Amino acid sequence: MANRGPSYGLSREVQEKIEQKYDADLENKLVDWIILQCAEDIEHPPPGRTHFQKWLMDGTVLCKLINSLYPPGQEPIPKISESKMAFKQMEQISQFLKAAEVYGVRTTDIFQTVDLWEGKDMAAVQRTLMALGSVAVTKDDGCYRGEPSWFHRKAQQNRRGFSEEQLRQGQNVIGLQMGSNKGASQAGMTGYGMPRQIM
């Protein structure tokens, strides 16, 4: 980020549009959930996009978050390093992203490492954390800590099974338009582009 110069023209417009998607209220809700979920000595960051980015940038908070969503002994990231080296921090972010995908977050909801590392798209980071919270609430396996109303519950399939007798009874039902001549028909329709014949 330090080596990147300012963007101009269309690039600047696109970046401004991306930055407008960031939600400060959502940031507060996510920070509260992460601190409550991790149940460790994680300090509350000052409000603001850049502080939120710096708080998550080394990957330790994200790794602690994904580990807290699993039962003890089944954590997907066994070793969390608090290294100051850039490639180690980026590696931890990518470990979090892989673990989130395994947990059930769709690949379309997962941000790219540079979105967080360079602060390119912090709204995408928020979307990933929201999707992770939604999956955690939906799983309802006892590992989620926090208000269930903070995240929406994802829809789950509810398959229905019909017996052969029920399927046969469904074939006996007469459709609503069968035998009716008042429904939609093509009477009076002319071909496309032809003039209407009025006599």
From Swiss-Prot:
Residues 178-188 have a biased composition (Polar residues). GO terms for molecular function: actin filament binding. Keywords: Phosphoprotein. Abundant and ubiquitous expression in neurons. Calponin-like repeats lie at residues 174-199. SUPFAM superfamilies: Calponin-homology domain, CH-domain. Residues 24-136 form the Calponin-homology (CH) domain. PROSITE patterns: CALPONIN_1, CALPONIN_2, CH. The modification Phosphoserine is found at residue 163. GO terms for cellular component: actin cytoskeleton; nucleus; synapse. Belongs to the calponin family. PANTHER family: CALPONIN, TRANSGELIN-3. This is Transgelin-3. The gene is Tagln3.
